[in-house]
Amino acid sequence: MTNIRKSHPLMKIVNNAFIDLPAPPNISSWWNFGSLLGVCLILQILTGLFLAMHYTSDTTTAFSSVTHICRDVNYGWIIRYMHANGASMFFICLYMHVGRGLYYGSYTFLETWNIGVILLITVMATAFMGYVLPWGQMSFWGATVITNLLSAIPYIGTNLVEWIWGGFSVDKATLTRFFAFHFILPFIIAAIAMVHLLFLHETGSNNPTGVSSDVDKIPFHPYYTIKDTLGALLLILALMLLVLFAPDLLGDPDNYTPANPLNTPPHIKPEWYFLFAYAILRSIPNKLGGVLALAFSILILILIPLLHTSKQRSMMFRPLSQCLFWTLVADLLTLTWIGGQPVEHPYTTIGQLASIMYFLLILVLMPTAGTVENKLLKW
């Protein structure tokens, strides 16, 4: 008799994806972030569902409903803070996952990589809309500033912004539609993630060496199920430490003030995970130029496979490229810091230099390093 997990139509899919899947024997902890992103997504959908049961998407009651969740709903405070800080964990895992892909050359799996970029953009859009929902000062002004960027698009810009707002300013219509989109998008993300996984399983996982591991595979279960479970436990531990000891560490105090269209906060800034892109946007004095730079700072990921010049896939044995990779990481941290600072000297200059460096590293220096390394190895 055939094992049910190999014969049942549904179980067969699960079996081929999570149990009998042939996996490289040498993938490190950097390969844990894919499953951790899955854990984050499930956690966000569950906590979000319970929050949606008590939340009202009306400008007059949205702020009060969030306060009500924290004060009157049983364990509402923990659900709210798990959801808010869960987003931060989500982005930490996302950036680590993308960084791993860049370092080890996983972007040569073109379909998987491009679906991943689409996922990244969708998650960013979802997080942005979620930040608007509590209807605090930073929610309102963040929504106003970011949606207003679209008005830089020639000819159709103003109409586009008013169409997104559903009126002449960020108001009730905007909040309602943002809530609707914020609710539906995680399920769309889950569906796209399935496609991401489907394309990955067409080729099999990459590994730290960047060399094909077809000659030597091990089953996913029990080796990587155990490893992923440990990763998930550590992730939940980190999240709960944040939620229970410093729930507001990554938030903005301005969001505890109800939204007021007549009073602008002194420093409008997004959540920490968008600060690098916000710094790039602010570093260009021209509105349209800033918007294009902002868009390109994320969309540049699509070009990465085209910019790969090395004859080796991974950076594991490429010290020159490694130096540039970690310079890029430092540059992104610098941009994140600058994005949270006021627009004044010396921050503006540092931001402009870091922005130039960001594009220079990806578009010029890293491809050049790949070519130089080929020459050094006489390839």
Swiss-Prot record:
The chain crosses the membrane at residues 33-53, 77-98, 113-133, 178-198, 226-246, 288-308, 320-340, 347-367. Heme b b566 binds at H97, H196. It holds the Pfam family Cytochrome_B. GO terms for molecular function: metal ion binding; ubiquinol-cytochrome-c reductase activity. Heme b b562 binds at H83, H182. InterPro entries: Cyt_b/b6_C, Cyt_b/b6_C_sf, Cyt_b/b6_N, Cytb/b6-like_sf, Cytochrome_b, Cytochrome_b_C_euk/bac, Cytochrome_b_N_euk/bac, Di-haem_cyt_TM. The keyword Nucleotide-binding does not apply. Binds 2 heme b groups non-covalently. Keywords: Electron transport, Heme, Iron, Membrane, Metal-binding, Mitochondrion, Mitochondrion inner membrane, Respiratory chain, Transmembrane, Transmembrane helix, Transport, Ubiquinone. Signal peptide: none annotated. PROSITE patterns: CYTB_CTER, CYTB_NTER. Its cofactor is heme b. A ubiquinone binds at H201. The keyword Transmembrane applies. It is found in: Mitochondrion inner membrane. One of its GO terms (biological process) is mitochondrial electron transport, ubiquinol to cytochrome c. SUPFAM superfamilies: a domain/subunit of cytochrome bc1 complex (Ubiquinol-cytochrome c reductase), Transmembrane di-heme cytochromes. CDD domains: cytochrome_b_C, Cytochrome_b_N. Component of the ubiquinol-cytochrome c reductase complex (complex III or cytochrome b-c1 complex) that is part of the mitochondrial respiratory chain. The b-c1 complex mediates electron transfer from ubiquinol to cytochrome c. Contributes to the generation of a proton gradient across the mitochondrial membrane that is then used for ATP synthesis. Belongs to the cytochrome b family. The cytochrome bc1 complex contains 11 subunits: 3 respiratory subunits (MT-CYB, CYC1 and UQCRFS1), 2 core proteins (UQCRC1 and UQCRC2) and 6 low-molecular weight proteins (UQCRH/QCR6, UQCRB/QCR7, UQCRQ/QCR8, UQCR10/QCR9, UQCR11/QCR10 and a cleavage product of UQCRFS1). This cytochrome bc1 complex then forms a dimer. This is Cytochrome b. The gene is MT-CYB.
